[in-house]
């Protein structure tokens, strides 16, 4: 991931520079010429994950889908993300209030830009916490959830790299960022106006929005806690999920549930292992290359295209930028960038996860018909996050290196938990 630290370093530094300019007499002139100078970093993130067009939301408060609500109610799904940034108050022990405000604002603003890069809508800033909505009426539910976990993962990466480096340079302890995410389906999220004339807001009423905040509070430091519906909708591989462990009188105790009552039943929570998740991307460098002579995307990379047979065309699918529908024809290609990477043979392997693939006993299989080729064809079939793996062998049939490409598949017809009483 080293190459991508630059994006976050530039994003953070640009926000510091931007807010420093607010106190400069030359700000108005510079702002007219450079008011979008920080946007290229956001655009880099969007392009990296295949996001096209303008960002979804450029405002705070009312979700753009519900500007017209007056005295009515509307039901529509949403994926809620709540992030809390703790530790920035220590800045007040070392700096003047002006400088504390500068750094805290740069941190919050950088977080906002990361969420907006994934089409998140900033609903509310609460001190050092931010409530973000992912999803809108034109977006598939699976893509809203994918956007949320991708944004949350990069937010934690931003903290583990750029922000950690900044705080250590100031001889301060790094920040502790906790993120909670949950999903409420259409019948479980009510949008309406709260308050009185002139003092009101349009917001969501949903236990799943409330639970996002609870999950944040339950998350370990610098981790992401996801609700049961997140996994139910995407069917995330177990290797990217774990049960929170707490010590009780020296004994490890599993904390599986956020709700465990007779009237509401059980609702589970899990830690989303964002480090393992990001480290499994073909398009992102690994966190450590110490034992790797060749690795993606520096030396090689798998790319994927959707084959549109009807129109005799193809479109590139950016890794895990969105979910693919079932029964889509795909073309995978291995691109070699390092001329020193000499190999004798290539083998392709499909690794599926999830209940649907498990039921059909199609979890893993070799693509023998494509042995020796730098490409292979496959079709989407099962809901979940699956991987196409490619292995390169030397003349002695020993593995030189390998790469894997992850893709989400979802028919957006998933059953999720509906808590409480429906109208």
From Swiss-Prot:
Region AGS-C domain: start-end pairs: 290-409
Compartments it resides in: Cytoplasm
Lineage: Bacteria, Bacillati, Bacillota, Bacilli, Bacillales
Assembly mode: Homodimer.
Binding sites annotated in the UniProt record for Mn(2+) 2: 84-85, 128
Protein name in the entry: Cytidylate cyclase
One of the GO BP terms on file: cyclic nucleotide biosynthetic process
UniProt-listed Enzyme Commission number(s): 4.6.1.6
Gene Ontology CC terms: cytoplasm
Keywords, ordered alphabetically: Antiviral defense, Cytoplasm, Lyase, Manganese, Metal-binding, Nucleotide-binding
One of the record's GO molecular function terms: metal ion binding
Protein source organism: Staphylococcus aureus
Origin: domain of life: Bacteria
SUPFAM superfamilies per record: Nucleotide cyclase
């Amino acid at each position: 991931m080293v190459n991508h630290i630059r994006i976050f370093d530039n994003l953070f530094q640009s926000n510091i520079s931007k807010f420093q300019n607010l106190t400069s007499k030359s700000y108005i002139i510079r702002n007219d010429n450079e008011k979008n100078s920080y946007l290229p970093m956001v655009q880099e993130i969007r392009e990296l994950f295949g996001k096209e067009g303008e960002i979804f939301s450029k405002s705070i408060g009312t979700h753009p889908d519900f500007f017209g609500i007056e005295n009515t109610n509307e039901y529509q799904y949403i994926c809620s993300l709540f992030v809390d940034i703790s530790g920035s108050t220590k800045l007040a022990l070392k700096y003047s209030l002006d400088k504390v405000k500068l750094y805290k604002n740069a941190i919050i603003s950088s977080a906002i830009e990361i969420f907006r890069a994934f089409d998140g809508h900033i609903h509310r800033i609460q001190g050092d916490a931010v409530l973000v909505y992912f999803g809108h009426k034109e977006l598939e539910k699976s893509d809203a959830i994918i956007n949320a976990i991708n944004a949350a993962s990069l937010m934690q990466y931003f903290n583990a790299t750029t922000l950690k480096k900044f705080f250590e340079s100031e001889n301060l302890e790094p920040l502790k960022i906790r993120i909670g995410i949950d999903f409420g389906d259409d019948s479980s999220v009510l949008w309406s106006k709260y308050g009185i004339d002139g003092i009101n807001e349009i917001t969501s009423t949903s236990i799943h929005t409330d639970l996002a905040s609870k999950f944040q509070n339950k998350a370990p430091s610098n981790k992401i806690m996801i609700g049961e519906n997140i996994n139910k909708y995407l069917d995330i591989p177990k290797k990217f999920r774990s049960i929170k462990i707490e010590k009780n009188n020296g004994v490890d105790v599993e904390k599986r549930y956020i709700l465990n009552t007779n009237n509401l039943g059980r609702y589970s929570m899990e830690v989303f292992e964002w480090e393992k998740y990001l480290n499994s991307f073909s398009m992102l460098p690994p966190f450590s290359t110490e034992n790797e002579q060749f690795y993606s995307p520096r030396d090689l990379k798998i790319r994927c295209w959707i084959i549109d047979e009807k129109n005799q065309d193809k479109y590139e699918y950016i890794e895990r930028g969105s979910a693919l529908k079932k029964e889509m024809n795909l073309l995978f290609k291995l691109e070699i960038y390092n001329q020193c990477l000499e190999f004798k043979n290539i083998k392709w392997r499909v690794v599926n996860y999830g209940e649907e693939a498990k039921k059909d006993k199609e979890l893993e299989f070799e693509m023998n018909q494509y042995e020796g080729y730098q490409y292979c064809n496959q079709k989407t079939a099962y809901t979940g996050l699956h991987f196409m793996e490619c292995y390169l062998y030397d003349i002695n049939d020993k593995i030189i290196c390998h790469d894997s490409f992850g893709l989400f598949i979802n028919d957006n017809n998933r059953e999720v938990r509906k808590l409480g009483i429906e109208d």
